[in-house]
Amino acid sequence: MIDGLFVIDAVAHAYNHLPENWADPVLGDAMVELAYALAADPPDPKYALGRDVYLSNWQVPDVANLLFRESDTDVAVMHPLAISSFIDGYSSVAKAAEAISKYPSRFIGAYACVDPLKGDEAIRSLEEQVDLLKPMGLKLYPTSWDGTKPVSWRMDDPKLIYPLYERAAKLGLKHVAVHKAVPIGPFAVGDAYNPSDLENAATDFPHLSFEIVHGGLAFLEETAWLLARFGNIYINMEIQNIIVERRPRTFAQILLGLCKVGGTGMLDRLFWGSGGTLHHPQPGLEAFAKFEFPEDLLDNSGLFMPMRQISRENKANMLSGTFARLHGIDIEACKRAIAGDEFSRPAGAPLPKPYSTISMAGQVEEWQRERA
């Protein structure tokens, strides 16, 4: 908990950045370099990581230590990444299964993730993951690799994507997370990262909820109109944890932009996500806990109504309440389940030094010593 508020991290990854995992060297290299660039040079150097450690094959116990021992994150949800430019996925289904099996009270669930380009094989993979993971939802990306080149698509494609929504619903899944806004490589993607294609999806599948992962980092106005118009569209704030730490005024502009059409109530359709090992989870939480909208931005925000200051209730919803309601999670039961476990700290005890509890702690310490 941070500032007395329970924290659910809605998306954690155990990345395998290693070249041995690249099916396509161009796209693989582009994606890992994008990830490292996002996390490089944090304001507080104690959260910096050298390339050798960052661009490694992260193991589940290290992800758990980062989230639950070294940060104020209480529980998390693991997302595998079925992007075919990586041989075993960028974050494998096996790691998601390991996380929820080894730490069930902390990794309270996982999403299934499939590559739509695989057609019937994607359907079979979804069915297998439903058996293995009992997933909370389905995660989709708008780009993958067809064996020769990157291919992108829209999330309202009736032949490629709608069969996945239909099968997910038949399998009991009610939630679909869609990566948007942040292209994953230096190649043409058309409008695949524009969330406007969710207009048709949200209309045609009103019984499903859609979370726009990275919503607001691009196509801000389009996203704001979607939030205002569709009650089954939400925002997963992954990467915004980095922005609130480093560029709080930009973070404020993003949140206010998302609320521009629908008003401050749209804040309660956003929920926290860090990406797990994308960047250390603690500094973003600390920055968000003390965050307020600059008054000059408030004075110039809102299309149809004035915006009010972010409240403690808004923060509680963004950190856990909204996601918990969406998925039927009992927060009090979660608190009881983690009380006194291996990650618990005595009241008032400080957090461990960043990266000191992971298996690569010695490498981190040596790199930071050389860098100083």
Predicted regions and their residues:
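Mid-to-C-terminal alpha-helical segments outside catalytic/metal-binding sites
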Residues: 1-10, 17-66, 124, 264-269, ...
